Amino acid sequence: MGKLIAVLLVWWPFMASSDNWFPVTVQADGVTQPYQPLAKANKIWRICALLPHGKDHYWWGVAWGLSEEASRLGVMLGIYEAGGYDQPDKQRAQLQQCRQKKADAYIIAAIAADGLSPELQQLVQAGIPVIDLINGIDGDNVTSHSVVSFTDMSATALRYILQQSTKPIRLGWFPGPKGAAWVRDADLGVQSLIQNGNITLLNAGYGPPDAFHQAGLTRQFYQDHHAVDFVLANAVAAKAVAQFQLRNPVSQSPIVAYYANPAVIEMLQMQQLAAAVTDSPVLQARIAVDLAVRSLQREKVPKRVSPQIEVLTPANLADFDLSRLLPPDEQWIIRRELLDIPAQD
């Protein structure tokens, strides 16, 4: 962690101010255009944000982006994290807690794509905005999606790998937690490119994106497969594989992460990863807050807004605006209760 702090201290002065993150280029309902958020909300709306967990530093950046944009717009925001992808009941309970608090709108990074369908249907039918953030929610029970396709993310990562080799490759694949919409979509992206016959896919198995589970999958994978040409992995597994390779030089192979978090950025800087794809999660969080406020103010919003996918390498990392991906140095996960409606005299 000390090395990561040193890296961020070098880069942070060059990162964009949180008040100057816009305009940014996005795909809005399939059209490439600049995204310009509101200057301020027209009242102090109360918004509830639900995240799957705070174990992966990826979500630290998301929580920070949510909090910063809510502050900039002048709205109240509660931020809840369920504790893991094995905690769907807790996320459902947190949703009910926000309903009891009469939240005006919801921003949800769902544990499962269909895990909250009945509750979300009730909210949308009542005219309460629901914004799908990052993970993906199935069906029509959302007002808008602030997401990047993980099908495109994993496919972009795999295309990068294919550009590095003209020979058939054995690919180690560490997808992430089974049942999550983003992992399902990432699987689809990989499957879409292995039909050319040049890839032998070796699936390491599914598991929660925490260090304990991904390290276990890594050990088992290398017991079953002593050598591969490339590894394509979720961000937490990418670190687990890199650490395993440092201890076991015979297992060396280039690693590509199909999304990025602070640990991935550190490993890129140290040249322990070949590349990583980023979906700019802080931007997605900021956009989600803006979409929620616009919806509350009866503005027409796009059904889907997606920042551009970018491939980061040790060579181009210094040119990337890290404020799209990372919170400031020493910023941890933000958890915050949604304040109750003030009592009327």
What residue ranges belong to the model's regions?
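Flexible loop/hinge segments that line or gate small-molecule binding clefts
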Residues: 113-152, 163, 261-269, 273-274
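Extracytoplasmic "Venus flytrap"
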Residues: 25-37, 45-65, 69, 78-92, ...
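Hinge/cleft segment of the Venus flytrap/periplasmic-binding protein
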Residues: 19-40, 283, 287-345
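Hydrophobic alpha-helical
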Residues: 105-124, 190, 207-267
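An alpha-beta-alpha
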Residues: 47, 51, 66, 155-199, ...
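N-terminal signal peptide c-region/cleavage motif recognized by signal peptidases
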Residues: 13-15
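Hydrophobic alpha-helical segments within soluble ligand-binding/sensing domains
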Residues: 145-171, 185, 213-215, 260-264, ...
